[in-house]
Structures are given as structure tokens and as C-alpha cells.
Design a protein with these regions (language model features):
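Extended, subdomain-level signal for the structured scaffold at the beginning of enzyme domains
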Residues: 1-126, 139-236
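Active-site cofactor/cluster-binding pocket
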Residues: 129
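Short, thiol/selenol-centered motifs that function as redox-active sites or metal-ligating centers
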Residues: 132-137
Length: 236
């Protein structure tokens, strides 16, 4: 699971928005993976602590709260994606998927990270799954090598948080300014189609890429991803 280690997004008007990975979009899928018997290894670009949008923590969800207590040390002391890319991407590595959790923090330090680009290409070439929810698909941009037709997700369809909804968030007071850039627009330019127009519970499976649209999709996304991964394990 690749988390962000950056806290502040600089908005188009120069203000700062405190962000990170969204606790529901990350936590609910994690619970499904753990209940299905999978281990989760957490990394950030350099091994700095994973940043979480604690203001979005579901304070009445005991299972999610326990998850974050249990994984507190792993979030505070994650592995380094740089080290992982250098040492762990072997033919016999025991991984089945790469998880890119949501939160606006997924747009910070990941979309242009060369080590994440290597990881996504490695996973794609080994037929591993890639899982991304809400703003997590922004990190898929790391796999871009410059030619849209050669982009590994060219022609794919995904569910993701729509740019049009992000443009509305300052109007309702959710964010202090407009987004500095639109990740959906950049994915569209690379040949990716976003299937949903609302921040709803849409989930989508296209080949080995599983995606979800928003926090509303987190439970169904986690269920779809976990069941799909289990089907692969059982078929081996």
C-alpha cells in the first residue's frame, strides 16, 4: 500500500489545505484485505510517516478505529518506496496487488514519483492487481512515460473522484480554494475514461485495475478487491 508522506496541498489561490490519505477510503478496504487473509505492507516515497486526514476519521466506527490503533506504528514508520523499488521487485516477490488509497494527499508526491512508476510497471508486467480509490488514481500518472498510446492504462475505464466535483468543493467550504490541477483531466489525456460523473459508490474492474469513486464506494471497493484477489489465489 503506497501512502503519501506530504501533508499540505497548496491551492490555486496560494492557501494550504491539510490533507493526506482518507481514513475511510484506506481503512475499509484494509479491513476487507485483512479479513480475507492478506498481509499489508505500507510504504511512502522515502519512508516518512504516512499522513492521514484525521479530521475525516469515523469516530463511531469501532472496527476502523481499532485498525488505526493496530497499524499506528506501521503508519508512523512505513517502508521506503525507494528501497522497495531497488530491492523488492523480484520475480518471486510474494505480492498480489498494489493499493493506492484515496484522499487529496494521493496527488502529492506520488503522480510524478519515478519509484512509483517503476512499481506500477512491474506490477502491470507481472499481472498483479492495482487498486485505486477516489483521488488514488492520480498516482497512476506515475506510470506515464510521455507517449499516451504507450501508457499502460491507455484504453482503461476507471471509477474516480470527478474533476467537476472537485471544482465545487470550495463553494461548500470543504476546501479553501480551487485545486492546483485536475488529475482526471490528465488521465483523460492519456486515454483513461472515468465512468462516473458523481462522487458516488461506483466501483469498476477493468482487467487487473480495480477502482472506486469516493468514500461512498470504500466498502464495496474493498469487498470487490478482496474477493477478486481471493479468486486468483484459489485458482492457483
Amino acid at each position: 500500500m503506497v501512502c503519501t508522506e506530504e501533508r499540505n496541498m497548496i491551492m490555486a489561490n496560494g492557501t494550504k489545505f491539510s490533507t493526506g490519505n482518507h481514513p475511510v477510503e484506506m481503512g475499509l478496504p484494509m479491513l476487507h484485505f485483512i479479513n480475507a487473509g492478506f498481509d499489508i505492507e505500507i510504504v511512502t516515497p522515502t519512508g516518512g510517516s504516512a499522513k492521514i486526514e484525521m479530521w475525516a476519521m469515523p469516530e463511531k466506527d469501532d472496527a476502523v478505529l481499532k485498525l488505526y490503533r493496530d497499524y499506528a506504528d506501521a503508519f508512523e514508520n512505513p517502508g521506503s518506496l525507494t528501497d522497495f523499488a531497488a530491492n523488492s521487485m523480484t520475480d518471486d516477490a510474494p505480492y498480489i496487488a498494489v493499493f493506492l488509497p484515496g484522499g487529496h494527499g494521493a496527488m502529492l508526491g506520488l503522480p510524478d514519483n519515478p519509484d512509483l512508476g517503476k512499481l506500477l510497471h512491474w506490477a502491470h508486467n507481472r499481472d498483479l492487481f492495482t487498486l485505486a480509490i477516489c483521488h488514488g488514481p492520480a498516482a497512476l500518472l506515475a506510470a506515464n512515460k510521455g507517449e499516451p498510446s504507450a501508457y499502460i492504462y491507455h484504453g482503461y475505464k476507471i471509477a474516480a473522484f470527478p474533476d467537476a466535483v472537485d471544482r465545487q468543493t470550495p463553494l461548500i467550504g470543504y476546501m479553501p480554494g480551487h485545486m492546483p490541477w485536475q488529475f482526471g483531466e490528465k488521465l483523460n489525456e492519456l486515454g483513461v475514461t472515468i465512468i462516473n460523473s458523481k462522487a458516488d459508490n461506483s466501483c469498476h474492474l477493468d482487467r487487473r485495475l480495480i477502482s472506486g469513486a469516493s468514500p461512498k464506494a470504500a466498502n464495496n471497493f474493498g469487498r470487490l478487491a478482496a474477493s477478486t484477489l481471493l479468486d486468483v489465489v484459489r485458482s492457483r
